From Swiss-Prot:
UniProt feature, compositional bias: Polar residues: 55-64
PTM note: Phosphorylated by host PRKCA.
Keyword Transferase: yes
Enzyme Commission numbers on file: 2.7.7.48
Family affiliation: Belongs to the influenza viruses polymerase PB1 family.
UniProt-recorded name of the protein: RNA-directed RNA polymerase catalytic subunit
Subunit structure and binding partners: Influenza RNA polymerase is composed of three subunits: PB1, PB2 and PA. Interacts (via N-terminus) with PA (via C-terminus). Interacts (via C-terminus) with PB2 (via N-terminus); this interaction is essential for transcription initiation.
Span(s) of short sequence motif Nuclear localization signal: 187-195, 203-216
Amino acid sequence: MDVNPTLLFLKVPAQNAISTTFPYTGDPPYSHGTGTGYTMDTVNRTHQYSEKGKWTTNTETGAPQLNPIDGPLPEDNEPSGYAQTDCVLEAMAFLEESHPGIFENSCLETMEVVQQTRVDKLTQGRQTYDWTLNRNQPAATALANTIEVFRSNDLTANESGRLIDFLKDVMESMDKEEMEITTHFQRKRRVRDNMTKKMITQRTIGKKKQRLNKRSYLIRALTLNTMTKDAERGKLKRRAIATPGMQIRGFVYFVETLARSICEKLEQSGLPVGGNEKKAKLANVVRKMMTNSQDTELSFTITGDNTKWNENQNPRMFLAMITYITRNQPEWFRNVLSIAPIMFSNKMARLGKGYMFESKSMKLRTQIPAEMLASIDLKYFNESTRKKIEKIRPLLIDGTASLSPGMMMGMFNMLSTVLGVSILNLGQKRYTKTTYWWDGLQSSDDFALIVNAPNHEGIQAGVDRFYRTCKLVGINMSKKKSYINRTGTFEFTSFFYRYGFVANFSMELPSFGVSGINESADMSIGVTVIKNNMINNDLGPATAQMALQLFIKDYRYTYRCHRGDTQIQTRRSFELKRLWEQTRSKAGLLVSDGGPNLYNIRNLHIPEVCLKWELMDEEYQGRLCNPLNPFISHKEIESVNNAVVMPAHGPAKSMEYDAFATTHSWIPKRNRSILNTSQRGILEDEQMYQKCCNLFEKFFPSSSYRRPVGISSMVEAMVSRARIDARIDFESGRIKKEEFAEIMKICSTIEELRRQK
């Protein structure tokens, strides 16, 4: 059927149609190949913005470093990173004056966190640069490798499991003359396969010891690995993002904890809250400005955009901010917090995989690793790449580029927000001392600025003053990309405000559909997404009902579980038809077993198993939810699980859904091809780690291994817990005498083995 799209909008207010203009349907673009070019762009741009700074050489690593701090004030509108220390400090002082005690209180909160955080905090997070293997690894593995290397180099502060003690090890490791590490390498050899008599390549994985001198170790400790940011919509060019190693992560975590604590107390900060809470916070600021602009005042809002926020920020500035914020605090605390910015002032950017060359005529492909870019003849490269390499060459050391100015993406979101808010804070009349004044919102690099003044000239003067004040601290408002409107219409972090926030529904589109975890989770996530959008995003009842029908259809096609009485033939239809015919109460069958859909928009909050439980045949119930059924993989399932859903912008967010352990909540097995690669050893370590943690959780159901278990080891803790539990069970008659004796015997054997070890 043909629909004239303009008809759809006849009854819709213009602001509600905004979401149709967003590039959020279909698959987002992914990057292919290496990120080396993007990383070189970042490094070169960052240096260009600070080019009038002073050059120095790092005495430890020999890396050339550019310091733009207190550099020349800009004379044009080009972006620049010449922040003035005294201006930043003054902005901090005024921020504290308007919020008495804010820094003091946040420091106290952070100090508590610093003393309590366990080192396993660092296992959260995705890919992490593993300096021992010089490539990315899952965070838990990278941490385990780091601790293992520290141990073998006589650094043992972190045995107690506090993050702060691990950081002491990091500091000590940097003073060592050399560090011995274990690296993995592959041996390939051609052997004849006994079965097929063909020649095959066999890979074996070896471990070898390697010594790093102080300089090499420092370079690795200060390295950020770079990748291309994937799935960015609405952009033509990709860009590089960084992942730091374990040495930097802990320090960054504490700085961000402090900054987060400050942001929570600032009404202009869009972080760390999100969703409806954020909307309420923003609406408050707007309301304040609109009520205060009496009939005599004009009020305008700028939907702001900053040019290259990260690349013009400077870690040295962050150091100045932290020094000021913590000025009355104990020495140890100030030291811990100042290390992150110091490390970032000396950071190195790893250039990634390098370039791939192929010769069409000779059908040859060859990889030029980043390490070779310093010496290779440039005639092989095209014009633009040649320029990049020439520019970056003076900065290269061992395949990494020295990058002192600038912050890589997403490292200090909270702290940079504090800096932005401190400028918004200066808009109060008592600081501007004229007829105009401003306020606004800041969330990392995104901002909205509301300016009030008696006339248009005043508005213009206010905007100019804000623009110039920002320049003093290295923030560059883009005049091309920011636009101004009467207050009441603006956009901030993809929230559109028009006398209240308009639901931008298109942003949620990517999270509709079947997630592909397993039949049980997918059903639950699918209906939860629809429910959440009815609550938060103006998804009306009719549209929700339609979304539900489309979802069920999509779900049935994905898992080939069409109703038992359908004519559609799939791989599963034979089994499902048989089940349908054998079942007395057909309404009790789950959708994934070919049953009917009983969901409507009123009962989306009920898990499907509960919805149909009373309708199920008894033997079906018994098969579906029997813990002894070998097909039910029971991870200890709490009543609530977390799924990762992909909204259209921003990071993947975690969404809670009700989880039910049935025969449908299977966990797919790991792809076997990994077992033949160099990752195999890592995989085994990871599984071992996983098994130990799972075992430990069985003994301590509250999974209290996040808290210190005192000085005893995990094994001792489990043995003593087993003894206590066994005694209680024996005395209450839950277990027999023989079982009790057997448990005690096993415990003694374990202790004996530990002694012998």
